[in-house]
């Protein structure tokens, strides 16, 4: 509270805090390879440049309705909140459950007549798997991770425009964009935003010709200040490019195409993109090694059905130690966000090595070939060999979505690596198979094959018992008392 005498004594105008375009507007944290997250310092000028480009291309203005799905801890929320505020658009905020439930998401899109929605490829695929037919008035923005060609082909006939947006947090949300058209191969990341330059460099820092692969480095107005309180790390990633100016080394491989657009070819280090979030494999490894039973650990990303990346952890136990998969996943879940919890934690007697003595990540066995000490993924216990038709249907979807050759009847969907997006796909596919709407909540409430199949059977019986509605022209039968 301000004392009255101070307020009276202050006769002049109240001072306005000074600020410049070079001041920080926010700091947002990304995964760090040593287990310590990195705080990216983004300046006002960085965000202003982003807004000035995106308001015209892809485009957003007064009269547009934007559906915001993203948590504030994910930097693309800038496009869902600050960009609409700067352009006069209307923002509808989706709740956490709305964003994870395709049926609720479809209802929001329809009810609010949304013009612009930005989401990760996993979220767009979740909508399509739930039977969403699209909206030709919708401008779909896709970012956070690579846009698979098959997903782009499925979205194009269902939306008015499909934009692929690319850029790391260190260059302020987005650095390039591309309006997708006919898909005949990898979807390019397009051309740089205004006042932004892309350079494809070789190991010596020299620009490579068109078509040659190199590291994508970004310069211009989008480049952030650096990492908060991490001068050495800042110096390693934000470099002096000489005549090219100050550059950020993305760690992504890419090349220029003959049509003047850029193509991103993935990482050249151990960073991964999981459900739109960029993570350092080393951060997850650091947490695993803190478990008393773990002697060595390595974390990798492997392709999963639907174009997603599945996070797998391989561990070597200390001599005499017993490792259970569920215990390791719980250990990580207590210390890291849910998207950084490995879908599988697999025990090996040793880690494969290259001739130079480094871990050979390409030689790590597929999950079904590894030694797994866990009750949830133990060998089939006999009762899964006697599945009824309902259980067999659920079991087949468990195996497909989790990319597992065998799933026990009593194994928990989420202990085996399931997450909310996969749960939404499971509910949608079961709903199509049974011709009933299956809420995603059912998977959380009944996460095993046996329990979910029993719930589905009871729901089907309840649906069959519903009295059919008669048309207005059909006479209703009289009850005994009425007769």
Q: What is each model feature region?
A:
Residues 11-210, 215-224, 242-248, 271-272, ...:
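Motif- and composition-driven signal specific to adenylation
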Residues 1-18, 47, 161-164, 179-385, ...:
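AMP-dependent adenylate-forming
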Residues 120, 220, 252, 419, ...:
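Short, conserved phosphate/pyrophosphate- and ester-handling motifs at nucleotide-, phospho-/glycolipid
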Residues 170, 305-309, 446:
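Short acidic/glycine-enriched loop/turn segments that link adjacent beta-strands
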Residues 36, 59-61, 229-231, 404-405:
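PAS/PAS-like sensory domain cap-loop motif
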Residues 14-18, 24, 141, 338, ...:
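Regions immediately C-terminal to embedded phosphopantetheine-bearing carrier domains
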């Amino acid at each position: 509270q301000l004392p009255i005498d101070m307020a009276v004594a202050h006769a002049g105008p109240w001072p306005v805090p000074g600020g410049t375009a070079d001041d920080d507007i926010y700091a947002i944290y990304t995964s760090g390879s040593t287990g310590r997250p990195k705080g990216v310092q983004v300046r006002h000028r960085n965000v202003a440049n982003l807004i000035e480009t995106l308001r015209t291309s892809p485009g957003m203005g007064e009269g547009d309705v934007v559906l915001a799905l993203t948590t504030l801890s994910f930097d693309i929320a800038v496009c869902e909140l600050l960009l609409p505020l700067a352009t006069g658009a209307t923002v509808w905020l989706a709740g956490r459950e709305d964003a994870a439930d395709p049926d609720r998401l479809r209802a929001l899109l329809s009810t609010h007549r949304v013009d612009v929605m930005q989401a990760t490829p996993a979220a767009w695929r979740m909508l399509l798997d739930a039977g969403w037919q699209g909206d030709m008035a919708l401008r779909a923005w896709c970012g956070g991770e690579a846009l698979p060609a098959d997903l782009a082909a499925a979205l194009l006939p269902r939306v008015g425009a499909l934009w692929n947006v690319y850029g790391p947090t260190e260059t302020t949300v987005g650095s390039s964009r591309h309006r997708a058209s006919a898909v005949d191969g990898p979807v390019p990341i397009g051309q740089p935003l205004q006042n932004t330059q892309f350079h494809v460099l070789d190991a010596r820092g020299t620009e490579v010709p068109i078509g040659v692969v190199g590291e994508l480095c970004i310069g211009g107005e989008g480049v952030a200040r650096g990492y908060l309180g991490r001068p050495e790390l800042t110096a390693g990633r934000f470099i002096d490019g000489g005549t090219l100016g100050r550059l950020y080394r993305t760690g992504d491989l890419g090349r220029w195409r003959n049509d003047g657009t850029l193509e991103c070819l993935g990482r050249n280090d151990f960073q991964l993109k999981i459900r739109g979030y960029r993570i350092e494999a080393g951060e997850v490894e650091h947490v695993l090694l803190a478990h008393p039973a773990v002697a060595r650990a390595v974390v990798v990303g492997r392709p999963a059905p639907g174009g997603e990346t599945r996070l797998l952890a391989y561990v070597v136990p200390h001599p005499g130690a017993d490792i259970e998969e569920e215990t390791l996943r719980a250990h990580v879940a207590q210390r890291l966000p849910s998207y950084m919890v490995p879908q599988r934690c697999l025990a090996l007697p040793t880690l494969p090595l290259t001739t130079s003595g480094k871990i050979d990540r390409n030689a790590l066995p597929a999950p079904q070939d590894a030694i797994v000490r866990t009750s949830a993924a133990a060998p089939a216990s006999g009762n899964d060999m006697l599945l009824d038709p309902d259980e067999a249907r659920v079991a087949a979807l468990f195996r497909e979505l989790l990319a597992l050759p065998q799933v026990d009847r009593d194994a928990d969907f989420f202990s085996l690596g399931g997450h909310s997006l996969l749960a939404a796909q499971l509910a949608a596919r079961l709903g199509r198979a049974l011709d009933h709407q299956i809420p995603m909540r059912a998977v959380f409430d009944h996460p095993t094959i046996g329990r979910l199949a029993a719930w589905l059977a009871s729901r089907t019986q309840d649906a069959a018992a519903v009295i059919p509605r008669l048309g207005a022209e059909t006479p209703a039968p009289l009850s005994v008392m009425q007769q």
